[in-house]
Structure formats: structure tokens, C-alpha cells
UniProtKB/Swiss-Prot annotation:
Binding site for substrate: 10, 42, 74, 88
Primary enzyme class: transferase
Catalyzed chemical reaction(s): (R)-4'-phosphopantetheine + ATP + H(+) = 3'-dephospho-CoA + diphosphate
GO biological process terms held by the UniProt record: coenzyme A biosynthetic process
UniProt source species: Photobacterium damsela subsp. piscicida
Name of the gene: coaD
Enzyme Commission number, as recorded: 2.7.7.3
Annotated site residues (Transition state stabilizer) in this chain: 18
Family annotation (NCBIfam families): coaD_prev_kdtB (TIGR01510), cyt_tran_rel (TIGR00125)
Protein name, as recorded: Phosphopantetheine adenylyltransferase
GO cellular component: cytoplasm
InterPro entries (UniProt xref): Cyt_trans-like, PPAT, Rossmann-like_a/b/a_fold
Pfam families, per database record: CTP_transf_like (PF01467)
MF terms in GO: ATP binding; pantetheine-phosphate adenylyltransferase activity
Pathway where this protein functions: Cofactor biosynthesis; coenzyme A biosynthesis; CoA from (R)-pantothenate: step 4/5
Length: 160
């Protein structure tokens, strides 16, 4: 039996923390589908197509990783892709309560959907897309927090 998992997120932009979790999930599971979410309540810096392309550009070395944009309920996306496991990252205890609520709601909506939590490598535990964008907006160097092509895309988007 092959295990298809979904690692969902906005990825605006994808960071070293995200990439760390994707690489680790790819080592544990047969197929990892990175679900790049369109959420109408969020105002991302990069549009959905840009976020998908950026995620693809930094995961090319992982043959069992697919990048797919989606909107709507995550459980419907999981069903469409025959996935029965969600991978979520927990940076700190403060993430746990919200993630626990989401996991229980997803389980209620799709009982066969399991959620697996991964903690980031210590050097990535404080990185968030929001903080990276804030640093980049103020012309700070984000190269230690995101892959090179993401740093370039941020600079182009913010200052071109």
C-alpha cells in the first residue's frame, strides 16, 4: 500500500522551515502532495500561480513530491488526491492548540484522514512566512531563512 500525504499551506513564500518538513515527509512517505492553498480571506504577496511555481522551483530534487494549488475544503482536496494523511508542522506550543482543533475538525469531516505533526529542525523553529516578508520589506537579508530563488523573488516583488 502506498501512502499519499498532503502538506497544506499558503506558502507565501515557502521558507527553509517548509522545505525541511517537505524533505523529511518525502523521506517517510511514498508521495507528498504540497497543497498550495488559495484562501480568499488572506491577502498573499504572491498569487497562487506564483506560489505554486516557487514551491516547484525549490522541490525539483524530490521526485516523490507534487505541488498542487487548491481552494476549498482541505478534506475535499485530500479525497480528490486519494490521500489519507495530512502533514502539519508545529513550530512551538502556541501552534498546537490551533492545529489540534483543525485536526479534529478534519477528522470529523473525513474520519479516515489522519494528521501527523512534525517539528522543525531547531534552526528553522522561529521562521514564518510573515516574519520573512516583514524582514524583506525592510530590506533585511532573508537568505538564511529561504532558498535563494525565493529571496530573489521577494526582492523582485517588493522592489521592482
Amino acid at each position: 500500500m502506498t501512502t499519499r500525504v498532503i502538506y497544506p499551506g499558503t506558502f507565501d513564500p515557502i521558507t527553509n522551515g517548509h522545505l525541511d518538513l517537505i524533505e523529511r515527509a518525502a523521506a517517510m512517505f511514498d508521495t507528498v502532495i504540497v497543497g498550495v492553498a488559495y484562501n480568499p480571506t488572506k491577502k498573499p504577496l504572491f498569487d497562487l500561480n506564483e506560489r505554486v511555481a516557487l514551491a516547484q522551483s525549490v522541490t525539483q530534487h524530490l521526485p516523490n513530491v507534487e505541488i498542487v494549488g487548491f481552494s476549498g475544503l482541505l478534506v475535499n482536496f485530500a479525497k480528490e488526491h486519494n490521500a489519507n494523511v495530512l502533514v502539519r508542522g508545529l513550530r512551538a506550543v502556541s501552534d498546537f492548540e490551533y492545529e489540534f482543533q483543525l485536526a479534529n475538525m478534519n477528522r470529523r469531516l473525513m474520519p479516515e484522514l489522519e494528521t501527523v505533526f512534525l517539528t522543525p529542525a531547531e534552526e528553522n523553529s522561529f521562521i514564518s512566512s510573515t516574519i520573512v516578508k516583514e524582514v524583506a520589506l525592510h530590506k533585511g537579508d532573508v537568505s538564511q531563512f529561504v532558498p535563494n530563488q525565493i529571496s530573489q523573488a521577494l526582492n523582485k516583488k517588493l522592489f521592482a
